[in-house]
């Protein structure tokens, strides 16, 4: 999710005011790899530049602490050992995103800022807090989060040269949204992520009149083994990233070193329009590339010579990744588009195409390489309170699985040096259900490699006075898989204090939080739900019912009947040390009062989960 509703439509009246800069020379000694930056979450915002030999290496806004930092951010200076770099700061008044200047009386841009925060900056062989990173009190242990700063949309998901790449929207210099870079992590198993340096930076020399400058917004990445682009060099088929450069348009970046660093394509921008978030993939039947990109629908012609409809996903094609032709659009969607094909489970040789947006709204239909045909009404992929957002699926997976990662929007971590997390990777399947074809996620099979201290019960009868209970470590991340045979009573599965209720009388489940979440204060420009709304799911008529849950610190993800219902939410309740299946005393069927009701637990597995993070 982004602050700018229309990425490339900038109000001419918008003026960003800067003050007199204050500069400091910092000599980077041999062995020093990080420039440590003190952060105060309540500090004043200044604009900073880090320079070498007169050229800006990065430019960002930051709340420099003048004393007693809340935490420390860092900038990698490995390449500048034995050299001097300069850091300068200046007072800064950010633009009001409605177009009016947000002048505040406490900021006077005509004077230089205090240099107290600048004087606390230092270079070292470690970043501040490195010895305790990944072991912080509230760090999720099986969900990816950055070492420092804010993260949101997953970007550029691609398998390349033996690694799964996870790029993501990242503010490396603050706990709130802003300074959009592409952060970068890699894993060989989709679990054990190694965070690397920032991969894509804002372009620093963009200064059009009235512009907010540049940010590296969301996009995707592909491999071009047929060299349709002509980008191959020295036998290397590069990683090619597509992203929205907010000051330019849709742009290409090229990497020849396994996605670690990127160079700018000289023909950028490849597309200028009122939109963002290009997802690119190869369409083999047509022997061409496809880009699905969100269009805001402002009354302006695309440079391709076609008119965009209101809030549509536009489909463009290209023979070479560089020249694009508008083909069609599907209206009613908002940002972060996806388009992919999936086989229909249980129907050999039958497949359908799925188009979805950031909110998890999707349609199933057909695609001929140029036009998407809607085959059934819009459905909602995530059924929770909006904590699942901006998901993307992997290109080029070696086993053809459709692997998805979403952003756990507004799952905040107050008091920590990081903020937000990615949701657990899932495999998507297309299933025939009571209401037609449904997109169904389940945790990737690799989760089993994290299991420890596993417990299993089978064929247990649950009655109103005899629940089935398993004790667990409430501080550990856990994975629960429970299968029930329908009885004559409603049943509750309590996972560390989070209640999941199934009412068999009406043959539907109500998955609800029972006093587990408190209202939260949004960090950045996002408004999270302040209450948890029960989720209703009509079951398919079978006598078996399955609930799967992953609980990790303040994150809980629920999968019902192998993903026929899915949702993620914030878990702020007081945790218990148990997983318990019990019969509810009210509602449901089974006759009158005084009759002992029962339910059958066919199988209930509870696994504690090993951390995905390395030990320091």
Regions found by a protein language model. Give the residues of each.
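Beta-rich accessory regions
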Residues: 20-38, 43-54, 77-79, 83-98, ...
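Hydrophobic core segments of beta-strands in well-ordered, beta-rich domains
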Residues: 37, 87-88, 153-173, 177, ...
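An acidic-aromatic loop/edge-strand motif
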Residues: 97-130, 249-252, 256, 267, ...
């Amino acid at each position: 999710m982004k602050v700018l509703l229309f990425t490339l439509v900038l109000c001419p009246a918008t003026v960003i005011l800067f003050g007199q800069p204050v500069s400091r020379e910092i000599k980077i000694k041999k062995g020093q790899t990080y420039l440590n930056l003190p952060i105060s979450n309540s500090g004043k915002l200044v604009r900073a530049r880090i320079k070498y030999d007169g050229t800006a290496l990065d430019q960002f806004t930051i709340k420099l602490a003048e004393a007693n930092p809340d935490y420390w951010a860092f900038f990698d200076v490995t390449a500048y050992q034995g050299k001097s770099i300069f850091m300068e700061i200046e007072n800064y008044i950010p633009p009001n995103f409605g177009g009016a200047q947000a002048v505040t009386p406490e900021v006077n841009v005509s004077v230089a800022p205090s240099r107290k925060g600048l004087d606390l900056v230092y270079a070292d062989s470690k970043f501040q807090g490195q010895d305790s990173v990944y072991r912080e009190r509230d760090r999720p242990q099986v969900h990816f989060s950055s070492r420092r700063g804010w993260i949101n949309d997953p970007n550029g998901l691609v398998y390349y040269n033996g690694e799964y790449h996870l790029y993501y929207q990242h503010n490396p210099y603050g706990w709130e949204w802003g300074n959009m870079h592409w952060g970068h992590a890699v894993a060989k198993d989709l679990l054990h992520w190694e965070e690397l340096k920032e991969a894509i930076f804002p372009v620093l020399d963009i200064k059009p009149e009235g512009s907010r400058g540049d940010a590296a917004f969301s996009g995707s990445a592909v491999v071009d083994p047929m060299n349709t682009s002509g980008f191959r060099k020295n036998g290397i088929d590069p990683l090619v990233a597509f992203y929205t450069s907010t000051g330019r348009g849709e742009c290409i970046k090229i990497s020849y070193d396994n996605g670690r660093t990127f160079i700018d394509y000289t023909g950028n921008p490849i597309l200028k329009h009122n939109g963002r978030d290009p997802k690119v993939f190869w369409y083999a039947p047509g022997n061409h590339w496809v880009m699905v990109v969100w269009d805001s629908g402002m009354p302006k012609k695309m440079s391709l010579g076609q008119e965009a409809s209101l809030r549509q996903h536009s489909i463009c094609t290209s023979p070479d990744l560089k020249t694009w032709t508008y083909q069609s659009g599907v209206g009613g969607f908002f940002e972060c588009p996806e388009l992919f094909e999936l086989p229909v489970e249980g129907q050999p040789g039958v497949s359908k195409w799925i188009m979805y947006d950031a909110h998890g709204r999707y349609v199933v239909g057909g695609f001929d390489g140029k036009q998407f045909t809607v085959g059934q009404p819009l459905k909602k992929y995530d059924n929770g309170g909006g904590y699942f957002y901006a998901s993307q699926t992997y290109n080029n997976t070696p086993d053809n699985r459709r692997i998805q990662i979403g952003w756990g929007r507004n799952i905040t971590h107050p008091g920590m040096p990081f903020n937000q997390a990615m949701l657990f990777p899932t495999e998507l399947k297309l299933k025939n259900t009571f209401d037609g074809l449904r997109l169904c996620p389940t945790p990737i099979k690799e989760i089993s490699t994290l299991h420890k201290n596993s417990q299993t019960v089978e064929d247990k009868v649950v009655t109103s006075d005899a629940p089935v209970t398993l004790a667990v470590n409430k501080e550990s991340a856990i994975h629960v898989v429970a299968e029930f045979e329908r009885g004559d009573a409603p049943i509750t599965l309590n996972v560390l204090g989070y209640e999941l209720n199934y009412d068999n009388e009406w043959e539907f489940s109500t998955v609800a939080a029972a006093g587990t979440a408190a209202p939260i204060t949004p960090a950045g420009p996002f408004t999270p739900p302040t209450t948890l709304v029960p989720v209703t799911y009509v079951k398919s008529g079978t006598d078996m019912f399955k609930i799967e849950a992953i609980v990790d610190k303040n994150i809980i993800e629920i999968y019902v009947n192998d993903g026929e219902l899915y949702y993620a939410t914030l878990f702020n309740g007081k945790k218990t040390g148990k997983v318990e299946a019990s019969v509810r005393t009210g509602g449901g069927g089974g006759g009158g009062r005084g009759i002992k009701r029962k339910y059958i637990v066919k199988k209930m597995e509870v696994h504690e989960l090993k951390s995905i993070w390395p030990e320091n």
